[in-house]
Amino acid sequence: MEFKHVLMILGVIILILAPLIMYSGLGEDEGYFGGADGAAGDLIMEISPNYEPWFEPFWEPPSGEIESLLFALQAAIGAIIIGYFFGYNKAKYEDKN
């Protein structure tokens, strides 16, 4: 195996392990990872306590796991579409040459 391949594999391993090593679990109780939606909702209620939303969602996932599944499915479908687009254009370019 060439040296540049070994370096690339080591780089990928470091990129995978670094966040796991750096994460200590601190801050979850303080809401550091609450997300933008929760922070925006809190800020709106602070600015205007009588604010009423214009509409409600017609369906809400029964659990956080299903919500995460739907988000991951949406990301996978988007990745497939983008991959198809790149593959189609690459094949079209190679066909010209």
Swiss-Prot record:
Membrane-topology descriptor: Multi-pass membrane protein
Main location: membrane
One cellular-component annotation, GO: plasma membrane
Subcellular location: Cell membrane
GO molecular function: cobalt ion transmembrane transporter activity
Pfam families: CbiN (PF02553)
Transmembrane segments: 6-26, 68-88
Listed pathway(s): Cofactor biosynthesis; adenosylcobalamin biosynthesis
GO BP of this protein: cobalamin biosynthetic process
Subunit-level organization: Forms an energy-coupling factor (ECF) transporter complex composed of an ATP-binding protein (A component, CbiO), a transmembrane protein (T component, CbiQ) and 2 possible substrate-capture proteins (S components, CbiM and CbiN) of unknown stoichimetry.
Family: Belongs to the CbiN family.
Function: Part of the energy-coupling factor (ECF) transporter complex CbiMNOQ involved in cobalt import.
Name of the protein described by the UniProt record: Cobalt transport protein CbiN
Name of the gene encoding the protein in the UniProt record: cbiN
